[in-house]
């Protein structure tokens, strides 16, 4: 019974993250080629002040810092990059989960949650990376769309 409740909670949270990310992606921020959204699954609200770093894989096969930011009151980061700078390549979005949970007085299992993805290999796209966090798990989803003119 507890498993079913937990499963329903996770599914509801994923639906919430997917819906809110899609709504915001089509708003005034639709020209932003990379947007991040983070939800605190324990408290059922946006995760505020989560440090996020974006890395790009270099030709030498190392990760180079590409962009960084901190989630706002809506759990979002916009304007991490511009269309001109966000070229084809392999990217890694790193969510600093340990600092977020420790600031709330919680000892989490994960120190970071990483999402690695290939961008713009099939033409220019806009990406929303959404993460749902809890102290012992995380899940992510992505919305990939054509730019809005």
Swiss-Prot record:
GO terms for molecular function: hormone activity; thyroid hormone binding. Transmembrane segments: none annotated. InterPro entries: Thyroxine_BS, Transthyretin/HIU_hydrolase, Transthyretin/HIU_hydrolase_d, Transthyretin/HIU_hydrolase_sf, Transthyretin_CS. Detected in liver. Residues 1-22 form the signal peptide. L-thyroxine binds at residues 37, 76, 139. GO terms for cellular component: extracellular space. Pfam families: Transthyretin. The modification Sulfocysteine is found at residue 32. Sulfonation of the reactive cysteine Cys-32 enhances the stability of the native conformation of TTR, avoiding misassembly of the protein leading to amyloid formation. The keyword Signal applies. GO terms for biological process: purine nucleobase metabolic process. It is found in: Secreted. The modification 4-carboxyglutamate is found at residue 64. Thyroid hormone-binding protein. Probably transports thyroxine from the bloodstream to the brain. PANTHER family: TRANSTHYRETIN, URICASE AND TRANSTHYRETIN-RELATED. Belongs to the transthyretin family. Homotetramer. Dimer of dimers. In the homotetramer, subunits assemble around a central channel that can accommodate two ligand molecules. Interacts with RBP4. This is Transthyretin. The lineage of its organism: Eukaryota, Metazoa, Chordata, Craniata, Vertebrata. The gene is TTR.
